[in-house]
Regions:
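Preference for long, amphipathic alpha-helical scaffolds in soluble/luminal domains
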Residues: 2-5, 22-322
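Sec-dependent signal peptide recognition
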Residues: 6-14
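Hydrophobic core
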Residues: 16-21
């Protein structure tokens, strides 16, 4: 091989290698690499996961569902922190936000712990108070249904309470096929529609529910912006994309390959990764900085899509908890 050919080959190897690297100018990061980096980032920044929206349950759930290596004491730290909160508050996580219970139940089920005995308190029982749960609106019903079904959807989904939440959710479908937190709103919004589809996953073999899911997917495709993102309440954010990726992965739609969600040759995963930072975190907006909520939701989306690609149980089907 002459020197010119050798140098040309070396150059091509360098270019190819650079294309595989994550970060600015390296193209869309590979899913597996991004997931590993975000898992490491979460453990470095959330060292003692609490019972809370940020730095708490969503971090635990995503790590547990990711299959990535986690410090052996990490999940026990969360359980202990939750137990302390439960005892300090005499079993009451909230008087009016029952998603506090749903989130904790999901986290416990994701790590194989029993939510009916945390420091002597049953934190799943409050979800039996249907009126209190739905006083929070559609959001409350969605996450109660996900939490109740999470450990064994096939066994739990037809229960009287689960069916009551299911009916409540289905009754709130908008004419455009979407869902909204505002019962009086004419149109659906991206985030609540995506969350609704996540809760309906165990029922997608039922014809009437499948029809609602299909309409919801079409709604999410139709309201997508020309640049591949979503605008919710006047703002573009990574969280809306993350929720949609989780939803599509749950109902068997490839968020990056399905033509309905492609814009200028890019799919939803590609668009989500424009918010991704080199350290594994996510930004809330493109011109913003790393954001804890955006990172938690982005991580959940990466895990959900990876599980879809690997043909594993979906993000919220925790019968295979690991």
């Amino acid at each position: 091989m002459n020197r010119l050919k050798k140098r040309t080959c070396q150059f091509l190897v360098l270019v190819t290698t650079a294309g595989l690297l994550t970060g600015c100018g390296g193209g869309t990061p590979k899913l597996e690499d991004a997931l590993k980096k975000t898992a490491a980032y979460e453990q470095e920044t959330v060292t003692s996961p609490a019972s809370d929206t940020l730095g708490g349950e969503w971090t635990v759930i995503a790590l547990a569902r990711s299959g990535e290596t986690v410090d052996e004491n990490y999940f026990e730290k969360y359980r202990a922190n939750l137990e302390k909160r439960v005892k300090d508050q005499e079993g009451v996580l909230s008087d009016n936000r029952y998603t506090e219970y749903s989130r904790a139940v999901m986290a416990l089920k994701s790590i194989g712990k029993d939510p009916t005995d945390i420091g002597g308190y049953d934190i799943e029982k409050p979800l039996e108070d249907f009126d209190a749960v739905v006083s929070q609106g559609l959001n409350g019903a969605i996450y109660a249904l996900i939490a109740l079904n999470a450990d064994d959807p096939d066994a739990n989904k037809d229960g009287e309470l689960e069916q009551k939440y299911l009916d409540y959710i289905l009754e709130r479908e908008k004419a455009d096929g979407g869902f909204s937190l505002d019962d009086n709103a004419k149109d659906g919004d991206v985030d609540l529609t995506a969350m609704t589809l996540q809760s309906l996953e165990p029922y997608q073999d039922e014809e009437d529910v499948k029809e609602v899911i299909d309409k919801g997917v079409e709604f999410l495709a139709e309201i997508q912006d020309d640049d591949g993102g979503y605008t919710a309440f006047g703002a573009k954010s990574s969280e809306s994309i993350s929720q949609t990726v989780i939803a599509l992965s749950a109902v068997g739609v490839d968020c990056n390959e399905d033509e309905r969600f492609q814009k200028d040759g890019k799919g939803l995963y590609d668009t989500l990764m424009t918010f991704y930072q080199k350290d594994g975190s996510f930004k809330h907006t493109l011109d913003g900085e790393s954001n804890p909520m955006a990172t938690d939701q982005g991580f959940c989306a990466l895990v959900a899509y990876q599980r879809y690609q690997d043909k594993e149980n979906s993000f919220f089907d925790m019968t295979d908890y690991r």
